[in-house]
Structures are given as structure tokens and as C-alpha cells.
UniProtKB/Swiss-Prot annotation:
HAMAP family: Rel_fac_1. The keyword Protein biosynthesis applies. Pfam families: PCRF (PF03462), RF-1 (PF00472). The gene is prfA. This is Peptide chain release factor 1. SMART domains: PCRF. The modification N5-methylglutamine is found at Q235. It is found in: Cytoplasm. Signal peptide: none annotated. InterPro entries: PCRF (IPR005139), Pep_chain_release_fac_I (IPR000352), Pep_chain_release_fac_I_sf (IPR045853), Prokaryotic/Mito_RF (IPR050057), RF-1 (IPR004373). Belongs to the prokaryotic/mitochondrial release factor family. GO terms for molecular function: translation release factor activity, codon specific. GO terms for cellular component: cytoplasm. It comes from Xanthomonas campestris pv. campestris (strain ATCC 33913 / DSM 3586 / NCPPB 528 / LMG 568 / P 25). Peptide chain release factor 1 directs the termination of translation in response to the peptide chain termination codons UAG and UAA.
Amino acid sequence: MTPTLRRKLEALAERREELQHLLSDPEVVSNNDKFRSLSRELSQLEPVALAMQEEARAKADLSAAEAMRNDPEMRELAEEEILAAQARLDELDAQLALLLVPRDPRDEGNLFLEVRAGTGGDEAAIFAGDLFRMYARYAERQGWKVEIESDSPGEHGGYKEVVARVVGRGAYSRLKFESGTHRVQRVPATESQGRIHTSAATVAIIPEADDVEEIVINPADLKVDTFRSSGAGGQHVNKTESAIRITHVPSGVVVECQTERSQHANRDKAMKRLKAQLVEAERSKAAAAEAQTRKLQVGSGDRSQRIRTYSFPQGRITDHRVEGLTLYDLPNIIEGDLDALIARLLHEHQADELARLSEGT
């Protein structure tokens, strides 16, 4: 471990002690919001503290074993214990380094998934449908809930656009690297000559804003339109203008919801999405400024960035953000088996963050 990382660990240990003192302060105890916030911070530091305690024990074991090595009768046993202690220290060193990677407070939360057909006409809409189905299948495997908020079906299948809310613990942490342009190479079902076509769809992953991130929206900045829903809900939705479209005039952000039977329920859902979009827009500005000073290999969240190619003739998926990340398992991945792909992206992100921490930036 580099000296820079070691200093950061020591700073976290000091912060933990400080938090323990603060949480026993009557003034803090009487302030529910502050107490809850500090308690959450302390709980996040516990894994670091436990690993550092384990490291101290392993160092003590190593010192004891090295002392035994001077005794001829104990030398063989000492050598074994030295090797075991060194292996444990190496393991803890890697574990502590990963614990230093900043934890995104949004990781455990829900998200909004937006998939839009790009270039490629009908085939792009069909591919957008395939991508949405892939994420829905993955969510089902994770035990998450997928709620479609609005959709615009393609003429020959798939979607011109579909927006859904994904509800489940850790949803954002697993899908946050999916934002960007996804490209497909395959022979469309509508192609009679057997030629391979290239088309694209864009994906946006937007974390749901929580109560702490509540922002104030001036009602005068909103343009609200109602229209007849084309979504689910039976005949009722086509008879009344229950669907809602809200435009935030200053930013140009537009959200729709048409899945609920009442206009009020659709408005509540649309406002929730609007708040999430505006919070994420502010974060994106900050991330763009940060990206000027360091390279972000994974997770920039830019939906215009081409991140992945799905080549059906070769049965492979290539992620262009990570060198050498090509998987020849397209049939299973497109059916929602994303674990191997997501694991590689998470590993790359952690390595990127550790490199940044080691540089002290």
C-alpha cells in the first residue's frame, strides 16, 4: 500500500474516533437529523475499522513468528506461521485499499431507466426493445421491481422510447455504468437479402433523488400538459386525459407518465422523475468539471458516448471503455445474464479510483 493510501486510512480511523465522541454529545443526540447522519457515517467506517484491527493482529502474529525463528527447534513452525501471516497481510492490504474507494451514497437506491431508439429506423426500435428486455430480465434475477412509466412502441416491435423505474436494493450500484450509446450489428428480421445492418439505441440511468436531495422547483417554471394515455390500464385511460407531460422550462427537461389511472398519480410520478433528472443534471456538470482533470474510464454517464457493441454474427459483446473487455456470450447476456459484464466494469472502476487515490488527487 502506498504512503498516500496509508495516510488516508489513518485519517479515517481518526474520523471514526471523532464520530464516536460526537454521538455521545447530548446536543447531537437531541438533533435527530444530525444523529442519523453521523450514525450512518460511522456505520460506513466500521468495515475499515474491523479490517485495520485484523491487520494489527496479523502484524503481531508476524512479529511473534519472526521472534520464534531464532529458536532452532521452532524454526520450521515459525517459517510456516510467517508465510501465513504475510499472506494474510497481503490479503488485508488489498481489502483495505478497496475499502478506501469512495462509496457512492446513491448506490443502494432506485433508478430511472430510459432507453431510446437511435439511428437505424425500425431495427433501432427493435434493438431498444431488446435492451429494455435485457435489463428487465436482469432486474427480475436480482429480485427488483420494474415499473414502466411511459413508452412509445415501434411500428414493427420494440420501442421508440421507454422509461421505467427500477426499484430494489443496490439497483443503481449495478446498472450505473450502462448509460451511453449501445450499437448492434446483425441481420434484421425485416432484411430479405441477409445483409448485416448497424443501428443504435441510447440508455440513460438516472438515480432516484432521495429526501436529502430534495430540490425546490418553482411552479412558474413548469408547463403541464395532459393527454390521453396510450399505455396500460384498459379502456379507461383512452377516455380521459389522465396522462401527464411536464416541461421544466429553464432546463428544457421533459418528463411523461401515463401508466396510472388517475391524473394525480401520474403527476406525482412525473414530478419524482423530474426532480431526479434535475439533481442528476447538476451532478453531471460537476462530473464534467472533474473529468477535465482526470480520465474517467467508466461511469461518466454521458449518453452520447458509444460504450458497447453487440455483434450477433460473432456472438460477442465489446465494451469500448475497458481495454480487452470482449465477452463471447451474447445470447445469454441479451437474456439478462449481466453479472460477468458488470463485475468487470465494477473492477475497472475500483482500479481507476484507487489509482486516483494513490496519486493524491
